[in-house]
Amino acid sequence: MNSQLQNNDKMIRTRFAPSPTGFLHIGGARTALFNWLLARRHGGAFLLRIEDTDRARSNPAAVEAILDGLSWMGLDWDGEPVSQFERADRHVEIAHELLARGHAFKCYCTAEETQLLRDEAFAAGRALRSPWRDRDASEARADTPFTIRFKAPDSDVVIEDAVQGQVRWAAKEFDDLILLRSDGTPTYNLAVVVDDHDMEITHIVRGDDHLVNAGRQSQIYDAMEWQRPVFAHVPLIHGQDGKKLSKRHGALGAEAYRDMGYLPEGLRNYLLRLGWSHGDQELFSDADAVAAFDLAGLNKAPARMDLDKLNHINGYHLAQASDDRLCELVTPFLDSLENRIEDINLTTARLKAAMPTLKTRAATLEELADQSYFLLRQRPIQLEGKAAKPLKDDETRQRLYRLFTHLGDLKAWNEAALSDALKQFAEAESVGFGKIGQPLRAALTGGAPAPDLALVMTFIGRDETLDRIKDQMTPATTE
């Protein structure tokens, strides 16, 4: 049976459990995606838990940022998000049950004694073991502060991981894990196990930086006689240079990719392929991804962030998106364009006319806005630098005047008619097409990125085309 199903055939329940200390990091977004896909593939549940036990670092604004990031990415969760902090009483209850079962003990070591023990253990090449694991608590004074520690195992610890295979640690590698601090608050590894058990999580997919934690947590599962979940520890994302992912590699929050103009489906597709494979297939719709995803496809080697590939994949999804949706999504990005028309209805009309072409020429919404600029430029278009050079001499401007007359006489105004008209005019003038195309493009676009000239004129219409040409039939613009 596939390892992802080996959990007594229970309904698959996965979870994403971020700490609310910042935005939805790109690595966390991938973890959430993998868990979401696994649950959706098998008709299970994808749950959300906020691990907010570190009150000093937990930030309500970060919680909102994480929820917003997941929502924007289209990763819907089942039920209400669970607050780990609010479950502290339950964590304490299990710590005392472990104490009663003989799997935990009260440790009365002071901070100074603990540090000394830690130094001695390090020098001996083993993890810390508290002397109180073999002493009776009655030996301590009644008012002495204590922690509750889990008794580290005396034999090797072994887990079966769906990605890493069998992982084994020698007993000496594990210390007597603190379950409850001296102030009575639970620690991470205890809280995680209790929450995952109570939430009936069957599969834990997370970064391999938690692999050692899985070794620790598996001991608590066994001590409580709880069934272990299926573990799947995925290698972390690296930069293109193979080094740990950082901001210079693209280690940003999901909202940063949104603000750069990536589509959620494009980012989902890219993150899916960042550490998971399904043959040679690279492009996935959501339905394709849900149908294909399994733990067997997760790679054991670290994936490398590749912004060029992200742009390629996002460009594909941009081209597949509906024109109406893109017209709406690109609107905020138009604010960066200078000297553009402000008529909203005219802007929308031109965008809708051109969108089937423009969306095949851009990788992001930001690029789509740049590709749209020629449509929206305010007349008269100011020509500067290279854009002005094709219109520097009188002969060119006189030819532009004749072209103005030629185009004005056209009966039909569509791509085919305009393309034929330009060719006929070049033949009549006995010049190469470049002698016509370059100055015409300068007059119509001002040097902004634009498709074929016949399409440009079709998109902006007869009146705007002739007006833009007329604006440049004046003494040559200087730099």
Swiss-Prot record:
Pfam families: Anticodon_2 (PF19269), tRNA-synt_1c (PF00749)
Residue interval(s) of motif 'HIGH' region: 18-28
Main location: cytoplasm
Entry similarity comment: Belongs to the class-I aminoacyl-tRNA synthetase family. Glutamate--tRNA ligase type 1 subfamily.
Name of this protein: Glutamate--tRNA ligase 2
Lineage: Bacteria, Pseudomonadati, Pseudomonadota, Alphaproteobacteria, Maricaulales
Role of this protein: Catalyzes the attachment of glutamate to tRNA(Glu) in a two-step reaction: glutamate is first activated by ATP to form Glu-AMP and then transferred to the acceptor end of tRNA(Glu).
InterPro entries, A to Z: aa-tRNA-synth_I_cd-bd, aa-tRNA-synth_I_codon-bd_sub2, aa-tRNA-synth_I_CS, aa_tRNA-synth_I_cd-bd_sf, Glu-tRNA-ligase_bac/mito, Glu/Gln-tRNA-synth, Glu/Gln-tRNA-synth_Ib_cat-dom, GluQ/Sye
Biological process per Gene Ontology, one example term: glutamyl-tRNA aminoacylation
Oligomer and partners: Monomer.
Domain of life: Bacteria
Presence of keyword Transport: no
Location in the cell: Cytoplasm
Motif window: 'KMSKS' region: 244-248
PANTHER family: GLUTAMATE--TRNA LIGASE, GLUTAMATE--TRNA LIGASE, MITOCHONDRIAL-RELATED
UniProt keyword annotations, A-Z: Aminoacyl-tRNA synthetase, ATP-binding, Cytoplasm, Ligase, Nucleotide-binding, Protein biosynthesis
GO molecular function, one term: ATP binding
Record field: catalytic activity: tRNA(Glu) + L-glutamate + ATP = L-glutamyl-tRNA(Glu) + AMP + diphosphate
The keyword Nucleus is assigned to this record: no
Binding positions for ATP per the UniProt entry: 247
A single Gene Ontology CC term: cytosol
Its EC number(s): 6.1.1.17
Cited NCBIfam families: gltX_bact
